[in-house]
Amino acid sequence: INLEDIAAPDCFIIEEKLKEKLDIPVFHDDQHGTAIITLAALINALDISKKLIKDIKIVVNGAGASAMACTNLFKNSGVKNENIIMVDRKGVIYRGRDNLNQWKSAYAIETKHRTLEEAIKGADVFLGLSAKGILTKKMVKSMSKNPIIFACANPDPEITPEEVNEV
């Protein structure tokens, strides 16, 4: 069964219940399809930039189903848990932050960063699954040398390729 266009947290609940009740594969494209393609792109970009997956720092902007699935797959592929910072519309998802639901709280880490601008400094990878224009040229400049930027917001990206090229 291929699930499509079901928002979090409903998608997690529906997928889990279907997997419990059915003896056939269940695939939520928004989560798993996005994660598979993004990991493939990351592996390619790391090869080109000569960076190692075990050493990179990633900032994931967005905390929906696709962001969580990408984060899980990145971790399962060798990115250290402490090297992934997830940011939602209220800021960094950190341990001790109030009002995190059970799904978001699973991605909370120990960090002093509270904003995207703080978290992005020195990052090797930006994965945007959020909103148009959220990543600025100033933020790109603050990233590591040869940063990897996946601006995947739909329909308009977090930053345009033209803006990145100006940096």
What positions do the PLM features span?
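Rossmann-fold NAD(P)-binding glycine/threonine-rich loop
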Residues: G133-V167
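Short, surface-exposed basic-aromatic patches at helix termini and helix-loop junctions that form
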Residues: L18-D23, N76-V79, K141, V164-E166
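General beta-strand structural signal in soluble alpha/beta enzymes
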Residues: N2-D5, V26-D29, V60, M86, ...
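Glycine/serine-rich phosphate-binding loop and adjoining beta1-alpha1 elements at the start
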Residues: N2-I56
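A short helix->loop->beta-strand "cap" motif at the edges of active sites that frequently abuts
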Residues: I24, N81-E82, S144-I148
